[in-house]
Amino acid sequence: MKLTRRLTLAAFASVLALGTAAPAFSADLIAIITPAHDNPFFKAEAVGAEAKAKELGYDTLVMSHDDDANKQSEVIDTAIGRGAKAIILDNAGADATVAAIKKAKDAGIPSFLIDREINVTGIAVAQIVSNNYQGAQLGAQEFVKLMGEKGNYAELVGREADTNAGIRSQGYHDVIDDYPDLKLVAKQSANWSQTEAYAKMETILQANPDIKGVISGNDTMAMGAIAALQAAGRKDVIVVGFDGSNDVRDSIKAGGIKATVMQPAYAQAQIAVQQADAYIKNKTVPKDEKQLMDCVLINADNADKLETFALKN
């Protein structure tokens, strides 16, 4: 489904620590639900949303669904039971999420989605996501340049249930496939996991010792790939990621991973809370439900400016 609106990216450089749990029932509560916080992208979302909610005077209930649709349903039930005024959600899968959001809507609780869209409109008040296709094309263009437009490469993709995995892969291939001397020799899902990416990269490398590059659907998998390559003494292999994490920033500065694409996790979450606040207070809805935020290429030229999914001035 085509996304129709772009938001201006504001630089949010500082990150506040996660606060304490909300009271059992709060008259002004915003629930913040994301995948597990061991991924720095999802942690930044939660921290950004909580910081903005507290700034606006709300109590917060921060929960994780761990990319499990059943657990997502349970934590949304918790938000409903606590009387949340709004839910900020990075969901556990486009198809599995529709019923959960509808359940919240039927209970009078509006949902504001971040990062991952669903394929249905009119259930969530807003869907604020990165322009994954635009970002993937940026990353692919840099990858082609780094590869010198030729050589064998592998692709690590994310969870199949996550729409972002497919959008990013399509964006990559719509650029790379125009270069016939770039040969895809392996394409495997590592489910956004660093551990899985390490294991998959070991297997790919054994089967394709002449591999020259790896393009990854997120930074966590890119970190797993670079670790496996370095363990095998293959520091010559080009790795490009997607997210803009501090870990990959540091790897770029150290000469490991060559590039990534920053998506504004912290800013997305804060904008979602601002829109939730406007809805709670005035029933104000955004002009467009689906809203895009552009991504930014990060490489050795600007890695110093990257801090927690935002560029410092």
UniProtKB/Swiss-Prot annotation:
Keywords, ordered alphabetically: Periplasm, Signal, Sugar transport, Transport
Disruption phenotype: Disruption of the gene does not affect growth on D-ribose and D-ribulose as a carbon source but decreases growth with D-apiose.
Phylogenetic lineage: Bacteria, Pseudomonadati, Pseudomonadota, Alphaproteobacteria, Hyphomicrobiales
Family affiliation: Belongs to the bacterial solute-binding protein 2 family.
An example molecular function term from Gene Ontology annotations: carbohydrate binding
Species of origin: Rhizobium rhizogenes (strain K84 / ATCC BAA-868)
A Pfam family this chain is assigned to: Peripla_BP_4
PANTHER family, sorted: D-ALLOSE-BINDING PERIPLASMIC PROTEIN-RELATED
InterPro entries noted in UniProt: Peripla_BP_I (IPR028082), SBP_2_dom (IPR025997)
Entry binding sites for D-apiofuranose: 39, 115-116, 162-164, 168, 218, 243, 263
Protein name: D-apiose import binding protein
Entry function: Part of an ABC transporter complex involved in D-apiose import.
